[in-house]
UniProtKB/Swiss-Prot annotation:
Catalytic reactions of this protein: O-phospho-L-seryl-[protein] + H2O = L-seryl-[protein] + phosphate; O-phospho-L-threonyl-[protein] + H2O = L-threonyl-[protein] + phosphate
Cofactor: Mg(2+); Mn(2+)
Name of the featured protein: Probable protein phosphatase 2C 74
Residues involved in Mn(2+) 1 binding: 170-171
Any one of the GO BP annotations: signal transduction
Record note on cofactor: Binds 2 magnesium or manganese ions per subunit.
Family the UniProt entry places it in: Belongs to the PP2C family.
Keyword Cell cycle: no
């Protein structure tokens, strides 16, 4: 009887049918075959890395295969020893190795991830800008997406700033209006002022009035351009234009501009709200009404808390876009700097507090950040945007 013994070790082969257990194969033959388990190598060649019962089944189980011509009675005689050896081999498997987790490791990793995510979110929600003679800090509120914006335009002649525009904008009802105003208003104001400047001498008695009129026209033109798009929402604004030694400040709504003269704060704008007697009278004379809610906030048509703004087409009959404009000569007035901010600051910080904070920070982005943080600590849930403009760079006031 011819016999071939395959006893050389074979590398384990991964097989879906056996869950990765070792499979020992043999060549096919046209003769009848019988699988014999050799007692000496049945356990040695068995793959002990698997705990699956299927890995120890009839597909080989790591046993040596003997191919021979055999009588049926011989096949029966080797079946029982093979099953017995497989059972013994199963009992010899080492226990499953379990590596215990370090106490508190998961909690520490989760806490670190939360801190990182919070820091990234804060960086996305906060913005700081350090420009040439101006600084900006802004932070998103807690109630909705960021709806504040700002704009700066400077014109230089022979290396000196002869004209500059600065603006802070506070949107409501989405970002459409504030984005439009931030992109258009500054250009419209500068173009109108430059046209007026070229048409007459700055020293003429009517020049200042004409510049103020040009600023009003630029505001109204910007509003008309936005309304023509049929887009909802609105925006408040406070802007400053420095031209030929004069400071022109204009505003709509409750954005505010405050100047520091020898350390004393003075508001150059007046908030446009229904709480103002003259604004309430204007609205009522136009057929509208104002009301005070349970939270003490006055609103136009039970809707809007400001009486002048860009956009707000449904209320345009009463909520106009014509700004109030003031002129301040810079020469000899002790002018130091200008603070322009959205109502997220002014609802929590007084004019003098803002001036004191900027003076203590020596005109820097840190001053703006300090004011933003002050408003948040005092409970402001609104967007807060603060811009500081150095006025001394235009003239030695």
């Amino acid at each position: 009887m011819a016999c071939m013994l395959c006893c050389s070790p074979l590398p384990a082969l991964s097989s879906p049918a056996t869950g990765g257990a070792a499979v020992v194969g043999f060549s096919s033959s046209s003769r009848r075959k019988a699988a014999h388990v050799h007692p000496a190598v049945a356990v040695k060649d068995h793959d002990l890395s698997s705990s699956s019962p299927a890995a120890c089944g009839d597909e080989g189980g790591g046993a040596v295969v003997i191919e021979e011509e055999a009588h049926p009675s011989m096949m029966m005689s080797v079946a029982a020893p093979a099953m017995k050896k497989k059972a013994v081999a199963a009992r010899w498997r080492p226990p499953r190795l379990v590596v215990p987790a370090v106490a508190g490791a998961d909690e520490a990793m989760a806490a670190a991830a939360a801190v990182k995510a919070a820091k990234e979110k804060e960086e996305e929600e906060a913005m700081e800008v350090e420009g040439e003679g101006f600084w900006v800090a802004s932070r998103r509120g807690l109630r909705h997406a960021m709806e504040d914006g700002y704009g700066v335009i400077t014109h230089k002649i022979e290396g000196h700033s002869q004209m500059a525009f600065y603006g802070v904008y506070d949107g409501h009802g989405g970002r459409a209006a504030v984005d439009f105003v931030a992109g258009r208003l500054g250009n419209n104001v500068v173009a109108a002022a430059e046209k007026q400047r070229l048409s007459e001498k700055a020293s003429s008695p009517a020049a200042a009035d004409h510049v103020a009129a040009a600023i009003r026209a630029a505001y109204l033109a910007t509003d008309s351009e936005f309304l023509s798009q049929g887009t909802r929402g609105g925006a408040c604004a406070a802007t400053a234009l420095v031209i030929d030694g004069d400071l022109y400040v204009a505003n709509l709504g409750d954005c505010r501009a405050v100047i520091s003269r020898h350390g004393a704060a003075a508001a150059l704008t007046s908030d446009h709200t229904p709480a103002r007697d003259d604004e309430r009278s204007r609205i009522e004379s136009s057929g509208g009404y104002v009301s005070c809610g349970s939270n003490g906030v006055w609103r136009v048509q039970d809707c809007l808390a400001v009486t002048r703004s860009f956009g707000d087409g449904g209320l345009k009959r009463w909520v106009v876009a014509e700004p109030e404009v003031s002129r301040t000569p810079l020469a000899g007035a002790g002018c130091e700097f200008l603070v322009i901010a959205s109502d997220g600051l002014w609802n929590k910080v007084s004019n003098q507090e803002a001036v004191d904070a900027v003076a203590a920070g020596h005109y820097s982005v840190d001053s703006c950040r300090r004011l933003v943080d002050m408003a948040r600590r005092r409970g402001s849930r609104d967007d807060v945007t603060v811009m500081v403009v150095d006025l001394k760079r235009f003239l030695n006031c």
